[in-house]
């Protein structure tokens, strides 16, 4: 049989294949690489949280794509809200979606799929469950520290084994840096400096 990957064009395998193709058949062409390859989605979300000018215009919702909007009801919407939540206030999240998705109890099943409470994962381009759990743990911890009542979905998540496991692990993604990449120097050093380690931790509210 043949390996099928509808996300092949986003993979490191494609990046390597096209890089080699360019070297062999397109001499003198651009050096092809992904500057985001070394980073986790958690770190990318953290960096993007500081790009305030784009918060009103970015989209990552398949359902609302034709209307250039967020539907506010799908796994993509809830994942993006979750991965951004350690870095933005609840009011900032509300402004992006027009509501606080964590207050929408109809999204509980999707939250359970994103965090691994349910075995089935959404058939959408969403990040890893470990990243979602880390993000939600940090968000719950911050809200409790600030004395802010947990919205319905986070209150439910607070009672789960997934929360307890994330609590034990803590923030395991701020220091992440995947050395399997084609990022050349000095760009690699720049990515590490701006998006990993202490700079990444500073963005957590």
Describe each model-derived feature in a short phrase.
Residues 1-205:
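Nucleotide-activated chemistry modules centered on ATP-dependent adenylation/adenylyltransferase
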């Amino acid at each position: 049989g043949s390996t099928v990957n509808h996300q092949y064009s986003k993979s490191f395998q494609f990046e390597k294949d096209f890089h080699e193709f360019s070297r062999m058949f397109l001499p003198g062409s651009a050096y092809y690489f992904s500057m985001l390859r070394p980073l986790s989605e958690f770190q990318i979300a953290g960096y993007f949280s500081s790009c305030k000018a784009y918060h009103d215009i970015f989209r990552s919702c398949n359902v609302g794509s034709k209307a250039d909007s967020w539907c506010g009801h799908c796994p993509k919407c809830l994942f993006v809200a979750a991965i951004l939540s350690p870095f933005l206030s609840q009011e900032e999240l509300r402004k992006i979606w027009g509501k606080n998705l964590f207050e929408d109890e109809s999204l509980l099943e999707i939250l359970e799929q994103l965090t691994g409470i349910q075995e089935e994962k959404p058939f959408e381009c969403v990040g890893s469950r470990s990243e979602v759990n880390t993000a939600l743990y940090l968000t719950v911890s911050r809200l409790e520290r600030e004395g802010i009542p947990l919205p319905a979905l986070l209150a439910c998540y607070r009672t789960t084994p997934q929360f307890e496991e994330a609590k034990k692990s803590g923030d395991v993604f701020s220091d992440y840096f995947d050395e399997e990449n084609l990022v050349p120097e000095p760009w690699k050093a720049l990515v590490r400096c701006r998006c990993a380690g202490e700079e990444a931790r500073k963005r957590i509210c």
